[in-house]
Amino acid sequence: MNCRVKICGITNLDDAMVACRYGADALGFVFYEKSPRYVAPDMANAIVAQLPPFIIPVALFVDADTSLVNSVISGSSRWTIQFHGSESESECISYQRPYIKALRIQRGDDVAALVDQYPSASAMLLDAYKAGVPGGTGEVFDWSLIPIGLSKPIVLAGGLTPSNVKQAIKQVKPYAVDVSGGVELSKGIKSEPLVQEFISGAKCG
């Protein structure tokens, strides 16, 4: 089965359409104002309204106020939510949308136990840990820390690029891979050749 691909940090319609054209399965939109890839809710919903069928838009939040989450997801029934902070399972499930919970992995973590704290999640995203940074570090973590047989589908993130995505899929065998900085010209602006190369590598990996 082909690995799915999420292109994260979408900030404009052109990049969204490029990702769709080359076979992305999901697009991530960052609603964390401290991120250089932040996009305003109205802009994101305008982009989502123009996406082709079967493309999943993913709304990324970091310990966000309920009002912000609701202001985004009320704009489209298509949204899946990605929680990238310290949200509890009860918080995640309260919005009654499919959700992905991100975990920042570091040595010594009981990854299986952390995953099991979110039985209602559609998938778990595993990212690199960096103190004080909720995600988007551009750093690869030690994939050997991921145990076999986790209870949820895994979305692998953290420093993925066109040059390492095949090896990542071969070693980890994730349900999906997630990339942002690894396919950018600058923060928030995607490179069409890199997007094409990454998706091709992931789908053929």
Swiss-Prot record:
Broadest EC class assigned to this enzyme: isomerase
Record-listed E.C. numbers: 5.3.1.24
Gene Ontology BP, a term: L-tryptophan biosynthetic process
Enzymatic reactions: N-(5-phospho-beta-D-ribosyl)anthranilate = 1-(2-carboxyphenylamino)-1-deoxy-D-ribulose 5-phosphate
Keyword Flavoprotein: no
Keyword Zinc: no
InterPro entries listed in its UniProt record: Aldolase_TIM, PRAI_dom, RibuloseP-bd_barrel, TrpF_fam
Gene3D superfamilies: Aldolase class I (3.20.20.70)
Matching SUPFAM superfamilies: Ribulose-phoshate binding barrel (SSF51366)
Pathway(s) of this molecule: Amino-acid biosynthesis; L-tryptophan biosynthesis; L-tryptophan from chorismate: step 3/5
Example of a GO MF term: phosphoribosylanthranilate isomerase activity
Highest taxon, organism lineage: Bacteria
Family the UniProt entry places it in: Belongs to the TrpF family.
Protein name per UniProt: N-(5'-phosphoribosyl)anthranilate isomerase
